[in-house]
Design a protein with these regions (language model features):
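Short internal beta-strands
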Residues: 130-135
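Histidine-anchored nucleotide/phosphate-binding helix
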Residues: 114-124
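Short glycine-enriched loop/turn motifs at secondary-structure junctions
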Residues: 14-15, 127-129
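Short, glycine-rich nucleotide/cofactor-binding loops
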Residues: 104-114
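A conserved regulatory-domain signal marking ACT and ACT-like small-molecule sensing domains
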Residues: 2-102
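Acidic/polar active-site rim loop that often engages polyanionic ligands
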Residues: 58-60, 124-128
């Protein structure tokens, strides 16, 4: 059983990461990703995945906590588990720290309703990105 002090220490020492993956769909991908995250003591806090029958691609987005702040270590563990599982298809895999704010260019049509919504969310902190330009 974990006491409150240990739980608090573990919480402070963890880093939140976001993992995204796109690869040709085949059985065992989610299992390999989960095993790779377990190898780095990762704890999945949020997960969304789907297979797209039209493109035959598997897409996954996972938010996780790990004791390491090195995103490349997390990515390497997942890549290794995919290889161990026999997944040799090309994999587009990205792991970044959750607090890293990506730069996003917003491109809009002449109708501004979507732009207004995006800027509202950004200004209120609901959309954690940096917006250098709107075109």
């Amino acid at each position: 059983m974990i006491d409150a002090k240990t739980a608090q220490t573990q919480e402070v020492m963890s880093t939140s990461h976001i993992l995204t993956l796109i690869t040709p769909d085949e059985p065992g991908i989610a299992h390999a990703v989960s095993a790779g995250l377990l190898d780095v003591d990762g704890n999945i806090t949020e997960n969304a995945q789907f297979g797209d029958p039209g493109s035959e691609l598997f897409c996954l987005r996972t938010v996780l906590e790990t004791p390491t702040d090195d995103s490349e270590t997390v990515a390497d563990a997942v890549r290794q588990r995919l290889l161990d599982a026999g997944h040799t298809s090309p994999v587009k895999l990205r792991v970044r720290q959750a607090d890293a704010r990506p730069r996003v260019l917003i491109m809009v049509s002449k109708f501004d309703h979507c732009l207004v919504d995006l800027l509202y969310r950004w200004r209120n902190g609901l959309l954690p990105v940096d917006i250098p330009a709107v075109v």
